[in-house]
Amino acid sequence: MNPGRLGLAPLLQENPLWISWHDSNWIPVLNPGNVMDYFSEKSNPFYDRTCNNEIVRMQRQSLELLNNMTGVEYIPLHVQDPILYVIRKQHRHSPTEATPMADYYIIAGTVYQAPDLASVFNSRILSTVHHLQTAFDEASSYSRYHPSKGYSWDFSSNKAIAEKTKTQTKKEAPVKEEPSSIFQRQRVDMLLGDLLRKFPLPLPQMTNNPTGGNPSDTANASNNHGGAAGDSDHVGADATLIKQEPTEGGVGRAGNNDVPPEKKMKL
């Protein structure tokens, strides 16, 4: 087994879009005539040793024979000497039909694989999402919440941290209580409503009458008893008043009985 290919195994397991290759000995003499020989170096991880180019190269034939062969091959696609060279990997089915597989470009002697359209879209979307996430994280760091005012923006976070550090060493002044706002009252009402729905108040239970009678009869009886007691109290009070207040007749009789005998009328 070729030991040179063993060293390329870890590189082939990686994403080919992440790697590059160059040979410093070829860079000063690189030109359109030898660019395919440069790309066919054994140390190049992008070159397939089973391609038709390798077969033609081993037979020392011209690359024009590739049009009459079928299989994987490499062809020079674009040349902009001395900086840019583009090489295409394709699968040839017939002399007039070939399917592109990958494109490689050589810039200043360094070989890269050109990304496909799906990789470009994925990279752009990932970059966009990353920057959006960073922007949202930055914006959320300036968001503030107050129970009576709700959410607000505070872009003086550094000043606030500095002032907070200074105030920790000083005695805190008493904070004046502020009246509740409409936002705070609405939030409190909503929280109380949620608590009542989760934990409803128990219904009042009816007490049983121990005598088994009608509650209305019991109430009437108590009223009658109270009325009788009130009447008896009134009667006693009237009798007392009658006893305490003497009548005129009694006063006259008492006056006649008390007259001395010498002053009684003689018949």
Curated annotation (Swiss-Prot):
Region annotated Disordered, chain positions: 202-267
| Record InterPro entries | Mediator_Med6, Mediator_Med6_met/pln, Mediator_Med6_sf
Q: Which GO terms describe its cellular component?
A: core mediator complex; mediator complex
Q: Polar residues: which segments have biased composition? A: 205-218
What processes in GO biological process is this protein linked to?
A: regulation of transcription by RNA polymerase II
Q: What is its main location?
A: nucleus
Record's keyword terms, sorted: Activator, Nucleus, Transcription, Transcription regulation
GO terms of molecular function: transcription coactivator activity
**Subcellular location, record wording:** Nucleus
- Spell out the family assignment given in the record's similarity comment: Belongs to the Mediator complex subunit 6 family.
Known function = Component of the Mediator complex, a coactivator involved in the regulated transcription of nearly all RNA polymerase II-dependent genes. Mediator functions as a bridge to convey information from gene-specific regulatory proteins to the basal RNA polymerase II transcription machinery. Mediator is recruited to promoters by direct interactions with regulatory proteins and serves as a scaffold for the assembly of a functional preinitiation complex with RNA polymerase II and the general transcription factors.
Self-association and partners: Component of the Mediator complex.
List the protein's name: Mediator of RNA polymerase II transcription subunit 6
Q: Which organism is it from?
A: Anopheles gambiae
